[in-house]
């Protein structure tokens, strides 16, 4: 079945503009950082409830948000889209956001929330964003990798059904220095096995044909193969299915793996 999804569209005019927009006809609210400034999770849930009704009215069933990244690097251009740098506050706000959109149970009146960007897209080297090759590295001074996991762990405990990893490379945190979407240690070992997530892992947009940090030397079909075996279930922004079909026909990806997704 087709599921229509959307980036945030409720920000006040002249909002962030980086995967977050102000669209006519929808109610207007602050960015996530503005919600964090209220220090009031009930306000976040109220917003999410209203936004859910607006999404349902136009047929949107998946929200490509919230961003549960921690703003630990003040130079990062996407800090406005986070709930700040405090992991406990971000956790509380994330759960309220999810509850408002999804409801207490997932049903026909729910809009799924795709929490992003696992395992945290905030610790960008020099503040450069991972949409660009110059910002591909994520670093963890003070050995604080686990701190960035806290909001995502809390989301998984509260009925998270779909999650998005970021473009960046978690430098020297895993066996390979490759981007999250190609990193089995991140997606299968950490997210699936250690944290216990059993929903859908959807890649960020264009990881095969655009932003494939750490695997630039692989061919397109090899990137598909590596990302699927790493744990990706759904590809954002990629539309060519021929490579997937070929991988299955050549037994490089088992049909059972596709069934799992």
Where are each of the predicted segments found?
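Glycoside hydrolase catalytic-domain context in secreted enzymes
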Residues: 1-261
């Amino acid at each position: 079945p087709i599921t229509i999804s959307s980036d945030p569209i409720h920000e006040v005019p002249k909002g962030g503009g980086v995967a977050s927009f102000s669209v006519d006809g929808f109610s207007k609210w602050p960015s996530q950082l503005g919600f964090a400034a209220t220090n009031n999770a009930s306000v976040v849930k109220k917003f999410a409830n209203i936004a859910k009704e607006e999404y349902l009215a136009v047929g949107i069933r998946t929200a490509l948000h919230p961003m549960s990244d921690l703003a630990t690097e003040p130079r990062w251009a996407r800090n406005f889209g986070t709930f700040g740098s405090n992991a406990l506050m971000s956790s509380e706000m994330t759960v309220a956001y999810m509850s408002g959109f999804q409801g207490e149970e997932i049903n026909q009146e729910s809009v799924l929330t795709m929490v992003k960007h696992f395992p945290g897209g905030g610790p960008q080297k020099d503040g450069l964003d991972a949409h660009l090759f110059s910002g591909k590295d994520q670093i963890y001074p003070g050995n604080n990798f686990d701190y960035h996991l806290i909001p995502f762990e809390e989301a998984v405990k509260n009925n998270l059904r779909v999650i998005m990893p970021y473009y960046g490379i978690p430098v020297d945190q895993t066996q390979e220095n490759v981007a999250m979407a190609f990193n089995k240690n991140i997606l299968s070992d950490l997210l699936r096995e250690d944290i216990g997530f059993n929903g859908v892992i959807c890649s960020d947009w264009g990881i095969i044909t655009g932003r494939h940090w750490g695997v630039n030397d692989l061919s397109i079909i090899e990137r598909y193969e590596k990302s699927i075996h790493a744990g990706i279930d759904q590809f954002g922004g990629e539309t060519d299915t021929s490579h997937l079909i070929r991988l299955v026909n050549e037994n490089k990806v088992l049909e059972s793996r596709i069934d799992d997704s």
